[in-house]
Amino acid sequence: MPKDGSLNRERILDAAEKLVIENGYAATSLDHVLRAAGTSKGAFFHHFGSKLDLARALTDRYVTADITNLDAALDATADVADPAARVVAFVRHFEDRADEIMSGQSSCLYVAVLTERQLADAGTADLINTAITAWRKGIADLLTEAATAGGLELEDVDALADHVFVTFEGAFLLCRSTGSPAHMRAQLGVLRRLLAAALGVAAA
């Protein structure tokens, strides 16, 4: 283990993320986190000043990973020459990885955090807005380029970009409520076909 204890910190965050997603922040006690992480209170307070501090760090890490996933999808589709086809390929990038996404987690941390008034008031909502803004800009830029290249008029690009983000969140809820991870792939497939139709490009 590194001398700075970074592996121990990540183990605590990993345990807390799973517990908060599964049970909610209020129902996840510090003792629950310590048991799941296999660590002590001393180790916990070496890295976090409080349970609320842990929640902020957890959200910050999740947001960073979320934006990294966005950037990875943009990079992976950067060589698609047709802007409209790139929009479709962008969604397909996640659709093809839907099973992997759902095997890693059963729901989204954003939902668990935003339903807790204490966390929202403590600034975690601002962290989440950072991710939402990044997704909106990234997707809106793709849509604008596609509309310009195709001579199309999209009524509200920002709202359409938000719809892409909302589809992910809604799919998480649908998977969680039904107990079936298959809904993530299905919903992304529907989104891909709708965007393809709007942009006048093949959905495949």
Walk through the language-model features, giving the residues of each.
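Helix-turn-helix
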Residues: 11, 15-61
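Hydrophobic alpha-helical segments that form the core
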Residues: 106-112, 138, 155-174, 190-194
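Amphipathic C-terminal alpha-helical segment
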Residues: 97, 141, 145, 165-182, ...
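Amphipathic alpha-helical packing segments from all-alpha helical-bundle domains
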Residues: 67-71, 85-89, 103-105, 121-147, ...
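N-terminal intrinsically disordered/low-complexity leader segments
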Residues: 1-7, 201-204
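Hydrophobic alpha-helical connector segments
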Residues: 57, 71-106, 157-164
